[in-house]
Structure formats: C-alpha cells, structure tokens
Amino acid sequence: MKYLVLTVRRPAFRDDVRDAHYAFLDRLRAAGALVAAGPFTDRSGGAYVLTADSLDAARELALQDPLHLERCSTVTVHEWDAR
C-alpha cells in the first residue's frame, strides 16, 4: 500500500535540519520504501510517498523523519490510493 506523508513547516523550522531530512529520505529510498519526494514550490513544506505494510508501519517510518524529531515540521501520514 502507498502512503502520502505531508510535512508542513512550523515557525521553528531550521535550515540545518534539511541535510538530515535528505539523508533520511535517501535511507528510505535505499530500503525500497520511498516512491517519490519533493518540496512544495512555496517552501511551506513538502510531501513524500512511502510503501509500507500498514498505516501504522508508515507512521512509524515517517515519525523518524528529522523534521519531526527536531520539531521543525508537522508530519501527517495518509493512506493513499494512488494510481
């Protein structure tokens, strides 16, 4: 199943966390869990698509994102019937 992860910047967003976030996405990609990722053009946040066995498993992965761990962005995971 595919899951859409939305990240929305908080006022406390710090640019120094971006590299850790990109490294996190690279690890997901290497593990075969990341389908696509990218920022919003208005720089308010971004989104990525995960494959996982369940919504809980997708949330567990997404909540390891440094953007969440450092409280720089809100992270929301949605089950997504992408075609």
Name each model-derived stretch:
Residues 1-83:
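Conserved, structured core segments of small domains
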